[in-house]
Amino acid sequence: IRIAGNVTNPSSTQELLIYGGVDIVKVGIGGGSACSTRFVTGCGIPQFSACLENSYVAHGLQSGIKKLGLVCSDGGHKNAGDVAKALCAGADFVMLGGYFAGTEECDGEWEYEYRSIIKKDIDNYKETFDWWQPIDPGYDTDKRKNSFTYYGMSTHIAQNNYEKNIKNYRASEGTRIVVKYKGELKQVIQELLGGIRSCCCYIGSDSIKNMPRCAELCVVNTLHNNKNPTLGV
């Protein structure tokens, strides 16, 4: 299976599928949670629009009864709802990175918090103070993961770690982000799958494949997109 990208222009998707012999086209530029490409280069379009336009072109190309190519939505999926929207926009796959940052299985830069216990005996009254703090108390105690730091692959940090040197002609197109500990990966995946199942239920779709056919799209403002006006949160 050959995967190529990233693109946002439908004509590029056509070229990759017809002339490049690609099976899957990755769609999306500048939408990643740790990405600053749109600010640094001025390039990129909204992820939902990119999926909608490129999947329409990719799925329209056929060799007999077989689809010539598929689309993978890459970047900008901050929650299960974003993944569901990408699938409704025609994405066959969704690529997630920062979504899983902070899970138990992550290997990288972790910050820990330490348990501190102080017992006091005042006038025959014993009291125990038990709390967690980010500072190591200096003695043997319990510790747990508190936060995780990750960065985009186009940052100077990644270039230095994986390419061994930083190209002087390249700009950093990403940043470092610190996220709180999220628990085990399976819990995050269960929440994600549950969100997709609920979306299918709401729109009346019996499968992921039929989500684009069942979904009805509308334009909303920032308030409705980022908050819940009913609950005021």
What spans do the regions from the language model cover?
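Glycine-rich tight-turn/loop motif centered on a GG-T
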Residues: 1, 30-49
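Metal-dependent enolase-superfamily TIM-barrel catalytic cores that perform enediolate-based chemistry
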Residues: 1-8
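Catalytic cores of alpha/beta
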Residues: 8-27, 77-92
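Short gly/pro/ser/thr-enriched loop/turn and capping motifs at secondary-structure boundaries
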Residues: 10-11, 31-36, 100-105, 111
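Alpha/beta catalytic cores of nucleotide-metabolism and tRNA/nucleoside-modifying enzymes
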Residues: 42-73, 78-233
